[in-house]
Amino acid sequence: MAEAPASPAPLSPLEVELDPEFEPQSRPRSCTWPLQRPELQASPAKPSGETAADSMIPEEEDDEDDEDGGGRAGSAMAIGGGGGSGTLGSGLLLEDSARVLAPGGQDPGSGPATAAGGLSGGTQALLQPQQPLPPPQPGAAGGSGQPRKCSSRRNAWGNLSYADLITRAIESSPDKRLTLSQIYEWMVRCVPYFKDKGDSNSSAGWKNSIRHNLSLHSRFMRVQNEGTGKSSWWIINPDGGKSGKAPRRRAVSMDNSNKYTKSRGRAAKKKAALQTAPESADDSPSQLSKWPGSPTSRSSDELDAWTDFRSRTNSNASTVSGRLSPIMASTELDEVQDDDAPLSPMLYSSSASLSPSVSKPCTVELPRLTDMAGTMNLNDGLTENLMDDLLDNITLPPSQPSPTGGLMQRSSSFPYTTKGSGLGSPTSSFNSTVFGPSSLNSLRQSPMQTIQENKPATFSSMSHYGNQTLQDLLTSDSLSHSDVMMTQSDPLMSQASTAVSAQNSRRNVMLRNDPMMSFAAQPNQGSLVNQNLLHHQHQTQGALGGSRALSNSVSNMGLSESSSLGSAKHQQQSPVSQSMQTLSDSLSGSSLYSTSANLPVMGHEKFPSDLDLDMFNGSLECDMESIIRSELMDADGLDFNFDSLISTQNVVGLNVGNFTGAKQASSQSWVPG
């Protein structure tokens, strides 16, 4: 203890050496040094009364300790030149030795000897003049209460947090409530740290912290002020945590919002219900998969994709008008797939009847069928029993054979599209039936194109042409009842047109093409079955309406969906007989039906509702090749070969029984797909 009076002289050089960058007081707060509290109490042993201020961290000392810090900085400038890095390092080593010895409870007097003995020779020589530093530690240890109290402050103003200060401010008010501005005023008035920080420049930081704590902690509640234009009151939440930090309020976001979760769940349920409803109401997909050679039996995913596509476009909003051209409607295919088209026909309808999809029930169309029955234009009349049988066939399950395959004959201006469950069809559907008057005066060929994966299509045709205006066709006395079949081919759903034209006769024709599902019938229903080994085509002919017997050679026929426009425009030039062939996955050919008195008539003599028949007053000349090249090839990049090929192979004779007319042969050119 005798060395205590001499301690101030050697202490100041040591403190100067430590102050510039290695001040011991900053280490506990920065958590970079495991500095013990006893060593903090021992190191700032100065005879002056500023021990408490010296033990503080510089940022906490603030303005009150500026004078002391300035004095130490001045002394550092005065002595810094003679110190050097070696002296600074020796001071640091001495501090480490003091830290090791002080917590161990050793005698302070033995500290310097131990520290000096444990150091190297060069460093020990530097520490010799500074060894009198540790003896004053007992004097500092006696008054260690104040330094400990000051150095344990959490914030610059003390141990209280912002939330604690706000709580005290609110509790100190008579009404136990304060506005935000009143809280600011209380801070400046009652907390010494904020006394000189009330102006706008220096108060931005701590005022923002107060606002943050008010919103963060659940112990504070905001109450609406009764007066208009006044800020809200902040009160202490009686249910909130009074001590410590309350749980934070989570901001409402897309992840934790219950409302969003519920709405998302409802949307998912609605979507699932919409998807399951068409599947349960109709077994058309199962019918499609039962076809052994059908392209739809390969992948149910493609069928599902087409089902979703048709459900999206099954509305008037998806079409411009009821008389939309098939060329324009074909652009809808591009929305679904670019490489492969959906395995379904493109269905067209007038504005009075939406285009139904294969995946939807057929019961909705029943009233419309009944209504349309009264507007049919029949040459020799269609009996009510036959119509009743036809309507009854709509609800037949796939396992039941169709009792009658009667064709529904009606005027040419209305195409009717039904669903995949089939109109009088056990395994397929009447996808489109268009009946129109036609003239039987001449024989006309028209190439019926079928699109298959951008492959060149070659069309075989017959050699008779005729020039007849649309007006003549419309006003013709001889009517032929023809039907158009929506057929399914592999790359594109081809729209096929089969001709069953008759004068003074009714007949029932059942046609079944494997990739094309139209007017399918069981093989035992007809009198003639022409089966292709590759496609399993069953085309049968039902009983005739009289004693007439029609023996037709039936084979595949397919049209692309866009061929209806081209063929309709050819009809304006009076196409009477057409020969076509389909390029699908397997072989395809052409079919020719003839019940005319003089010439066999092709069934594509129809006028779909796509054509505005009111605008034609005279003859209309159309160039089929230019139409296809401009509208079809430009859109899809298809390659067509219009070389007329008349092949003599696979020639099937067409026999017309009980009819006054010449027999004609239809030639079929089988081209591998």
From Swiss-Prot:
Tissue-specificity statement: Ubiquitous.
Q: Answer yes or no on keyword Mitochondrion.
A: yes
Region entry Mediates interaction with CHUK/IKKA and IKBKB/IKKB: which residue ranges? 300-673
State the encoding gene.
FOXO3
Q: Please state what the protein is called.
A: Forkhead box protein O3
Give all N6-acetyllysine modified positions.
Answer: 242
Species this chain originates from? Homo sapiens
- Could you state what the record's PTM comment says about this protein? In the presence of survival factors such as IGF1, phosphorylated on Thr-32 and Ser-253 by AKT1/PKB. This phosphorylated form then interacts with 14-3-3 proteins and is retained in the cytoplasm. Survival factor withdrawal induces dephosphorylation and promotes translocation to the nucleus where the dephosphorylated protein induces transcription of target genes and triggers apoptosis. Although AKT1/PKB doesn't appear to phosphorylate Ser-315 directly, it may activate other kinases that trigger phosphorylation at this residue. Deacetylation by SIRT1 or SIRT2 stimulates interaction of FOXO3 with SKP2 and facilitates SCF(SKP2)-mediated FOXO3 ubiquitination and proteasomal degradation. Deacetylation by SIRT2 stimulates FOXO3-mediated transcriptional activity in response to oxidative stress. Deacetylated by SIRT3. Deacetylation by SIRT3 stimulates FOXO3-mediated mtDNA transcriptional activity in response to metabolic stress.
Keywords assigned: Acetylation, Activator, Apoptosis, Chromosomal rearrangement, Cytoplasm, DNA-binding, Membrane, Methylation, Mitochondrion, Mitochondrion outer membrane, Nucleus, Phosphoprotein, Proto-oncogene, Transcription, Transcription regulation, Ubl conjugation
